[in-house]
């Protein structure tokens, strides 16, 4: 019977009596790492200069033109600290930055902390400790853990989004966006002051037949506020009474509950701050083409923005027109009913007092009147998430007792409300064509509504696949074909019918061609404490005013407690009461905003968690600037377009940004939006924040669950005869093994501190970089870490005697084979480091090290390049060996070895020899051997001769440099 621990048991090498005194052990690695980290800090090894400002060269010299800006998605400093999955991307970017620094590039690499958020606030609620106290303690621990890894960051540029000096500029950017509007003619944001100037000059119309000069102050403010890029709106939001706050869509699970706390979430209307990101839909789409980003991420953003071309159609009612957007105006004759979102503004105006005499009982929701039915239906769906509402389950809905006029045929169609139509998408209304849409077909079948065939498959077009189906009594037909039952469209194909119907609608004044987007404006407010306060106050008329820059920052006040008012989790009718409302002296303030001192009240919401991360790349470029978020010279140097290097369409931005694909849409879309506004307003020269993006994979590990499906600590599980057991509190139990993302929730975390203690940080770095391609997920196995450690021990032994500690290098010349392998390794690792292929770089270094070990090579000419090549992966070990090789200066700034092209040319080539397609032998010939010489060598090979057994080949094909194929 075998019993093997499956968890992360200690693997520290113990100092046995026979262990050489100067062996590279975990203990020696720790000493070397601490010493070099201290020296790097003292010398400012990774400090990098700016063109201007406090970080400019003290001697007034110019900064190098050849720069490189490398950035990680910064971490949230949780109380649990790091596990071994977290450093994967940080180590990869450090290897990349170190390589380019060694080649002479001026590299900016820094790391801050995304520190606002719910976890610190919830801890504060539970303990009464200020969130800042907990957050700053967590940051100290994160810096300690990250510091052990030897990451070459410019520590002068580090910050937290919770630093007042940082969020002052978050508030400043908010005001820039608030004080801007989007000029559709120029396709860019412009200052609101310019809009007002155009109104005053009469060069821009107010609309609705009104003149600016005839409006009073309040009306003028309303006109301007309606055009701002930040605006207040009564929006349908995700209200979570159990958390006392509004949640963004991404914070709600698919079953309509809060991601944190698992509380019910309800859809309701609240007055909220919104950002008009939709104004930038086309630019956000178009500029994806110039970004060096993974195709997967670009596709996700394109789908999220969701651009589609169709027609806007107006259906007349007694309470006003219902506008719908459709990509299939050709099917308008098949629209037999309409559906509004239950929250649609028109519902309360359209709903009838009584049911029509012949109403179908299925349409009434069991209510006595349409109004009662609407109220009951709204209550029944209040807790459903958007995803739940759109899933293909049984269709529900209510007839509201009203009808609309189909503009194609003037027929009256009943108007329903149903949960599968969402108020926040499109117009919040659809024309239902059950013959051409399966969802509409399901609804029509459920409620006994007419289903009309309007597109008929054409079976007599040779080679044309018109799609299955066509019998609309069985299912909707969504394929191509010709129009039927469609009046003047009959006989047209779908494409022609779309164009014809759109033209008819436009001519009749009942519609027009239109482009629609799935993207919605950004809900930009949270009813929490631990976030950036809004630089907004309200006057006695409840009108919002942006604060002037000289009144920034608006600092978070202390409050009696940090929790919002929490409600019964099922109380959908409750209203938010944010924690900041409790700071009454802070809320009620007297200010002079240019028209004398007046009483105002501050906004008591805070910004969402995405605010700081939407611009933080700019602060790395100029972290100590008190006059601007980033000096233009510094932004242009680090992030400005470089068409000579990246092509004429270069948008500028950070040279490399690495982080998880989970941020593909929200963070990256929001940061692109903010950056484009800043670009339009002249604050930055780059039109995109991130020129190149790489998504690292996950580190995964085995996890274990008991019979209830609950996770148990992986480190405590043992394996016996292929089964797994956990010594639980009530005795040992058998558990199930599964594989998943490493982390706290699966109880399979491994701390990097453990690996650093047992092997050293350089071993952890080499192991994580050797596990596979950066973009791929990879399995963690602590037992395999020793392989990386043994590789570093071999490198150490090539330079240092384990017995004496003396340097053992010589000045011997290198033989031809070693020279060729050395320069192939230099060329290969340089290419790999530049392409983030750190796993293959490590493999090449291991191959070269093994060659030197087997051949007992001790020549300085072979070992110094090895140390330099190892440096990006294992910088502490490399620095120490470089010092022992007689160099006083750090190797952090290179030089990285340069391959000699002469040794990259092969003198000989090995040809596999195939006989009838199968390899039967191999021959080595001169690289420049002619085809007849290669053929002769192949036919003379002993194995080939034996296989031919005297037979004469019909043909011999020589593929130069690749293979020989003998055909019998």
Curated annotation (Swiss-Prot):
Binding residue positions for ATP: 744
A single Gene Ontology CC term: cytosol
Gene name of the encoded protein: leuS
Keyword Protein biosynthesis: yes
Cleaved signal peptide residues: none
Biased composition (Polar residues): 1-13
Pfam family, one: Anticodon_1
GO biological process terms on file: leucyl-tRNA aminoacylation
Residue ranges of the motif 'HIGH' region: 75-86
Matches recorded under HAMAP family: Leu_tRNA_synth_B
Compartment(s): Cytoplasm
Domain of life (superkingdom): Bacteria
Documented EC number(s): 6.1.1.4
Species this chain originates from: Mycolicibacterium vanbaalenii (strain DSM 7251 / JCM 13017 / BCRC 16820 / KCTC 9966 / NRRL B-24157 / PYR-1)
Family: Belongs to the class-I aminoacyl-tRNA synthetase family.
Alphabetical list of PANTHER family matching this protein: LEUCINE--TRNA LIGASE, MITOCHONDRIAL, LEUCYL-TRNA SYNTHETASE
Name of the featured protein: Leucine--tRNA ligase
InterPro entries, per database record: aa-tRNA-synth_I_CS, Leu-tRNA-ligase, Leu_tRNA-synth_edit, M/V/L/I-tRNA-synth_anticd-bd, Methionyl/Leucyl_tRNA_Synth, Rossmann-like_a/b/a_fold, tRNAsynth_Ia_anticodon-bd, Val/Leu/Ile-tRNA-synth_edit
A single GO molecular function term of this UniProt record: ATP binding
Keywords noted in UniProt: Aminoacyl-tRNA synthetase, ATP-binding, Cytoplasm, Ligase, Nucleotide-binding, Protein biosynthesis
Motif 'KMSKS' region in this chain: 741-745
Region annotation (Disordered) ranges: 1-22
Catalytic activity: tRNA(Leu) + L-leucine + ATP = L-leucyl-tRNA(Leu) + AMP + diphosphate
């Amino acid at each position: 019977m075998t019993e093997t621990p499956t968890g992360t048991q200690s693997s520290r090498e113990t100092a046995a009596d026979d262990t050489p005194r100067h062996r590279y052990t975990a203990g020696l690695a720790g000493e070397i790492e601490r010493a070099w980290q201290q020296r790097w800090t003292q010398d400012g090894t990774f400090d990098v200069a700016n063109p201007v400002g406090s970080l400019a060269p003290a001697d007034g010299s110019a900064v190098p033109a050849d720069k490189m800006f490398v950035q990680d998605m910064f971490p949230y400093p949780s109380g649990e600290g790091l596990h071994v999955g977290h450093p994967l991307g940080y180590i990869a970017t450090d290897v990349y930055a170190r390589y380019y620094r060694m080649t002479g590039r001026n590299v900016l690499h820094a790391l801050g902390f995304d520190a606002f958020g719910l976890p610190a606030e919830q801890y504060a609620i539970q303990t009464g400790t200020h969130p800042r106290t907990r957050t700053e303690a967590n940051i100290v621990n994160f810096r300690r853990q990250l510091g052990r890894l030897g990451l070459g960051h410019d520590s002068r540029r580090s910050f937290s989004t919770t630093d007042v000096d940082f969020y002052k500029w978050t508030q400043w950017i908010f005001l820039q966006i608030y004080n801007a509007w989007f000029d559709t003619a120029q396709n860019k944001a412009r200052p609101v002051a310019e809009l007002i100037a155009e109104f005053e000059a009469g060069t821009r119309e107010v609309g609705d037949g009104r003149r600016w000069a005839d409006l009073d102050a309040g009306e003028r403010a309303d006109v301007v506020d309606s055009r701002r890029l930040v605006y207040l709106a009564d929006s349908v939001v995700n209200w979570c009474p159990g958390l006392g706050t509004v949640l963004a869509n991404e914070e709600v699970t698919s079953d309509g509950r809060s991601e944190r706390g698992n509380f019910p979430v309800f859809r309701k209307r609240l007055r909220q701050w919104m950002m008009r990101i939709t104004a930038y839909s086309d630019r956000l789409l178009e500029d994806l083409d110039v970004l060096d980003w993974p195709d997967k991420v670009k596709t996700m953003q394109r789908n999220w923005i969701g651009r589609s071309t169709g027609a806007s159609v107006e259906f007349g009612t007694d309470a006003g027109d219902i506008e719908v957007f459709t990509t299939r105006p050709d099917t308008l004759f098949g629209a037999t009913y309409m559906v509004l979102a239950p929250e649609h503004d028109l519902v309360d105006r359209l709903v009838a007092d009584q049911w029509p005499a012949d109403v179908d009982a299925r349409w009434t929701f069991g209510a006595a009147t349409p109004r009662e039915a609407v109220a009951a239906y709204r209550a029944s769906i209040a807790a459903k998430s958007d995803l739940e509402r759109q899933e293909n389950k049984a269709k529900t809905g209510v007839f509201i007792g009203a009808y609309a006029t189909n503009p194609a045929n003037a027929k009256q169609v009943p108007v329903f409300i149903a949960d599968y139509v969402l108020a926040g998408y499109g117009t919040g209304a659809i024309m239902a064509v059950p013959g051409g849409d399966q969802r509409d077909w399901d609804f029509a079948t459920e409620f006994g509504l007419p289903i009309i065939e309007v597109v008929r498959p054409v079976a007599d077009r040779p080679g044309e696949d018109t799609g299955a189906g066509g019998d609309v009594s069985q299912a909707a037909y969504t394929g191509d074909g010709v129009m039927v039952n469609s009046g003047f469209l009959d006989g047209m194909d779908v494409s022609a019918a779309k164009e014809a119907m759109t033209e008819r609608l436009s001519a009749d004044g009942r519609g027009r061609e239109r482009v629609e987007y799935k993207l919605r404006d950004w809900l930009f407010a949270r009813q929490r404490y631990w976030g950036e306060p809004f630089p907004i106050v309200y006057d006695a008329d409840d009108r919002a005013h942006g604060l002037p820059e000289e009144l920034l920052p608006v600092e978070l006040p202390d409050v009696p407690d940090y929790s919002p008012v929490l409600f019964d989790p099922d109380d959908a009718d409750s209203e938010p009461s944010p924690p900041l409302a409790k700071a009454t002296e802070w809320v009620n303030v007297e200010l002079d905003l240019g028209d004398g001192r007046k009483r105002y009240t501050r906004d008591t919401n805070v910004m969402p968690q995405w605010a700081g991360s939407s611009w933080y790349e700019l602060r790395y470029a100029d972290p100590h600037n008190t006059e601007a978020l980033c000096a233009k010279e510094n932004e242009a140097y680090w992030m400005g377009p470089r068409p000579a290097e990246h092509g004429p369409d270069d948008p500028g931005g950070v040279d490399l940004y690495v982080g998880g694909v989970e941020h593909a849409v929200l963070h990256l879309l929001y940061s692109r939006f903010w950056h484009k506004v800043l670009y339009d307003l002249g604050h930055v020269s780059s039109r995109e924040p991130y020129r190149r993006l790489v998504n690292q994979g996950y580190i995964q590990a085995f996890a274990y669950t008991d019979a209830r499906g609950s996770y148990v600590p992986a480190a405590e599980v043992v394996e016996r005869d292929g089964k797994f057991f956990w010594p639980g509190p009530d005795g040992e139990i058998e558990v199930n093994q599964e594989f998943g993302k490493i982390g706290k929730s699966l109880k399979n975390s491994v701390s990097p501190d453990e690996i650093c203690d047992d092997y050293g940080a350089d071993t952890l770095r080499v192991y994580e970089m050797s596990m596979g391609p950066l973009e791929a997920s990879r399995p963690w196995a602590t037992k395999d870490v020793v392989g990386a450690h043994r590789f570093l021990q071999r490198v150490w032994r090539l330079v240092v005697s384990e017995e004496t500690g003396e340097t053992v290098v010589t000045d011997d010349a290198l033989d031809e084979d070693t020279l060729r392998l050395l320069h192939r390794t230099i060329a290969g690792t340089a290419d790999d480091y530049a392409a983030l292929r750190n796993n293959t770089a490590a493999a090449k270094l291991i191959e070269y090290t093994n060659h030197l070990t087997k051949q007992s090579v001790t020549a300085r000419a072979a070992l110094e390049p090895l140390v330099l090549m190892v440096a990006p992966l294992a910088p502490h070990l490399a620095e120490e060996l470089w010092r022992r090789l007689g160099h006083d200066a750090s190797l952090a700034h290179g030089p990285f070895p340069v391959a000699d092209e002469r040794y990259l040319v092969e003198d000989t080539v090995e040809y596999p020899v195939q006989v009838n397609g199968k390899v039967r032998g191999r021959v080595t010939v001169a690289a420049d051997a002619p085809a007849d010489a290669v053929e002769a060598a192949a036919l003379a090979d002993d194995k080939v001769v034996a296989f031919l057994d005297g037979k004469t080949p019909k043909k011999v094909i020589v593929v130069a440099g690749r293979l020989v194929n003998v055909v019998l």
